[in-house]
């Protein structure tokens, strides 16, 4: 009763491009990731249709129109909606795997429907009717089975304004977190030193002590401690961007064997090197266990503890976030030293890699400064999460 529906096109990503003056096209992937609930084309970007691929028949979007993603592997993402709040003079159409709806009877104000169709009550209804096994889908006929509450336009305006302001604050918070991450990464890349250089690009004023070259075996020792009698059941994995994390929570499954007695047992503050390489992590990843008191790791990992009289633990954890340790590995592992996703680096060779460090006093200064930035970043992430929880609470309580 609320929406009339219009045909959409099936243009795939190879028929779309950014940065031209051609008609814009909403691909369903952007509904899932990339666009806010309320789309403002004065700041949000849609791709343009590549020349020669404009559909023969189409319906231009109007402000207040909504678009739903008609398919997803996740029932929570089926019928995820966006609303065109401000077209900013642009011509836009709805594309692949979208459902284009319009309130032709003006029962709602511009900016309300996107949130109404994002509400918890609406998506509870969608989950009941979504069809499929691996891929869940809906069509416009399914909406006849769904209901949304429509309050007075005055109340709609208050609801939409509140939620839009929260969304804008979330967007600002996201940019702030991104800027802090960029700052931390830039400092890390400039404050540490490769073993083939004498100095790092960035030094703190008054710190002129020369850097020293060490081999891994000079400041750490290997851990081969086994998980006897399965004393620990927490299986860890290295996620390059998140550190040592619970394997089951991260993957939503465990790939470890039932008997964990043969796994390495590591304690909080100890390190592990994952020789698996992936995009952006050509030489694997080294992470310190920080989230849990202890955990177990496959014997494919190289685990070690450090001599804190030789190197500061926080300093080393940040050092391994940089790319400066890659040179030490590349010196012992040639281009062909990769086998089935693993770097072909022996334990002995790994502990023989060279690294260049500041004196202990400067190590602690560097670690302290980076700890302050990291704590600020974590505080801002916690605030971001609270804004998201607030929005979800309102989406649950303000709509029927």
Name what the model sees in each region:
Residues 1-15, 145, 203-228:
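Non-catalytic DNA-recognition/assembly elements of restriction-modification systems
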Residues 3, 117, 191, 219-220, ...:
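Hydrophobic aliphatic residues
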Residues 3, 13-52, 62, 85-87, ...:
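DNA target-recognition patches
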Residues 12, 52-55, 132, 254-260, ...:
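Short, solvent-exposed loop/turn positions at domain surfaces
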Residues 13, 91-99, 108, 123, ...:
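A short glycine-rich beta-alpha junction/loop motif
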Residues 27, 38, 48-118, 262-325, ...:
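A short beta-sheet element
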Residues 142, 149-212, 356-400:
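Amphipathic alpha-helical coiled-coil/heptad-repeat segments
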């Amino acid at each position: 009763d609320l929406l009339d529906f219009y045909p959409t096109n099936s243009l795939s990503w190879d028929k779309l491009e950014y940065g031209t003056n051609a008609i814009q096209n909403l691909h369903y992937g952007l509904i899932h990731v990339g666009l806010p609930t309320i789309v403002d084309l004065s700041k949000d970007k849609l791709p343009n249709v590549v020349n020669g691929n404009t559909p023969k028949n189409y319906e231009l979007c109007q402000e207040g129109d909504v678009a739903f993603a008609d398919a997803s592997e996740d029932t929570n993402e089926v019928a995820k909606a966006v609303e065109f709040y401000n077209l900013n003079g642009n011509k836009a159409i709805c594309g692949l795997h979208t459902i284009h709806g319009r309130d032709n009877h003006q029962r709602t104000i511009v900016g309300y429907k996107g949130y109404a169709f994002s509400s918890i009550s609406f998506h509870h209804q969608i989950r009941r009717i979504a069809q499929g096994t691996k891929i869940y889908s809906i069509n416009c006929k399914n909406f006849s089975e769904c209901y949304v509450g429509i309050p007075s336009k005055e109340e709609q305006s208050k609801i939409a304004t509140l939620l839009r302001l929260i969304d804008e604050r979330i967007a600002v918070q996201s940019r702030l977190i991104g800027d802090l991450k960029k700052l931390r990464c830039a400092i890390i890349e400039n404050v540490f030193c490769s073993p083939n250089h004498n100095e790092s690009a960035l030094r703190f004023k008054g710190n002129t002590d020369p850097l020293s070259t060490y081999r891994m075996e000079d400041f750490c020792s290997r851990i081969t401690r086994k998980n006897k009698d399965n004393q620990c059941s927490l299986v860890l994995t290295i996620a390059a961007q998140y550190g040592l994390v619970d394997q089951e929570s991260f993957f939503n499954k465990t790939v470890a064997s039932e008997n964990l007695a043969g796994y390495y047992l590591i304690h909080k503050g100890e390190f592990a090197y994952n020789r698996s390489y992936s995009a952006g992590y050509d030489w694997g990843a080294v992470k310190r266990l920080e989230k849990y008191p202890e955990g177990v790791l496959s014997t494919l990992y190289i685990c070690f503890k450090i001599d804190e009289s030789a190197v500061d633990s926080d300093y080393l954890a940040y050092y391994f976030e940089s790319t400066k340790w890659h040179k030490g590995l590349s010196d012992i592992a040639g281009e062909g030293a990769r086998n089935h996703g693993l770097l072909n680096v022996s334990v002995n060779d790994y502990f023989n890699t060279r690294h260049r460090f500041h004196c202990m006093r400067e190590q602690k200064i560097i670690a302290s400064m980076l700890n302050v930035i990291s704590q600020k970043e974590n505080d801002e992430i916690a605030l971001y999460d609270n804004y998201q929880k607030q929005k979800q609470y309102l989406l649950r309580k303000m709509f029927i």
